[in-house]
Amino acid sequence: MSQYRTFTAQDAVEYAKQFGGLDNPSSLVEAQEIGDGNLNLVFKIFDAQGVSRIIVKQALPYVRCVGESWPLTLDRARLEAQTLVEHYQHSPQHTVKIHHYDPELAVMVMEDLSSHKIWRGELISGVYYPQASRQLGEYLAHTLFHTSDFYLHPHAKKAQVAKYINPEMCEITEDLFFNDPYQIHERNNYPAELEADVAALRSDDQLKIAVASLKHRFFSQAEALLHGDIHSGSIFVAEDSLKAIDAEFGYYGPIGFDIGTAIGNLLLNFCGLPGHLGIRDAAAAREQRLTDIQELWNTFSERFQALATEKTRDAALSVPGYASQFLKKVWTDAIGFCGTELIRRSVGLSHVADIDTIKDDAMRHECLRHAITLGKALIVIADRIDSAEALVARVRQYS
């Protein structure tokens, strides 16, 4: 049995030779550490011609951006690998392929996506992938439907819930989404110029009650196997292609959480675009984001309902009209969770480049305020926004 050790670049090369599944493993000669996230080491493995062939990812036993003072379970590597393997079974065209994983070393070997680019960077630059939102909707529909009560036998579903219990990573989400932004906490991160805006979050009882309701659903609604962190930085895109990666927050939770997180990141980009592009280009890109949001939800809901009509196994859940009713609740959840994503990415520990890389301080602060104001509104009035078109109208109202 393997014993955990932190990989060096050479360790990653040797591991890729053994478990990468390549026809000519001896061609692998060099590794480059490319991880820019908070939790892991990520190595690109190159052959003698300088071509990247495979990826080796290893979990660290602490939060990288904080240090060893914030320890983390290594079991998250198993949960991430198993989540991606499960999602790949249901949406292979939109999920990164895992070739091998070792739970003792907390390491996995996965396909190289050098032909793709991280969606967040492309969104910031104003590069438009018209298929991406629809493909993300397809990914979410297939992965969430096929791991839900609509499709799984009750015994299998309960076994899956137990298999994917992920308490330490869920606790991070619970703190960063639902606790920290609404109290004074050392993890919070925002400019002094926003102190009044953040203080208003802490004093808004109506908002905090709505956030408590969302947190309660996150605690208790084991509806499907979530990706758990499906933002534009955990999605790779290319022409006519989209792949989800980075699922260490995977667990059984409310379907609306994945939908809301995805929509929230599109709205964070919407808020930040005036700080990156000229007036006309920013306005055009903002319209694209609003179209993306509508296409994401409409694709997801149409595909989920089609799958429910075709494949639902439970007699009660297969009653005509129930899937549509269920999705109305998912949508309301999604709007609320979307709002928490907007707020926590503006005042909490982990921000997004869509806003944080804006060079002009005044513009950056204005974009942060926009995200906070929009997030508050969506959380509080989620049950009054009954469609993607209604959401777009609300976003325009707060722009």
From Swiss-Prot:
This is Methylthioribose kinase. InterPro entries: Aminoglycoside_PTrfase (IPR002575), Kinase-like_dom_sf (IPR011009), Methylthioribose_kinase (IPR009212). The gene is mtnK. One of its GO terms (molecular function) is ATP binding. Pathway: Amino-acid biosynthesis; L-methionine biosynthesis via salvage pathway; S-methyl-5-thio-alpha-D-ribose 1-phosphate from S-methyl-5'-thioadenosine (hydrolase route): step 2/2. It is an enzyme of class 2 (transferase). GO terms for biological process: L-methionine salvage from methylthioadenosine. It catalyses: 5-(methylsulfanyl)-D-ribose + ATP = 5-(methylsulfanyl)-alpha-D-ribose 1-phosphate + ADP + H(+). Substrate binds at D229, R344.
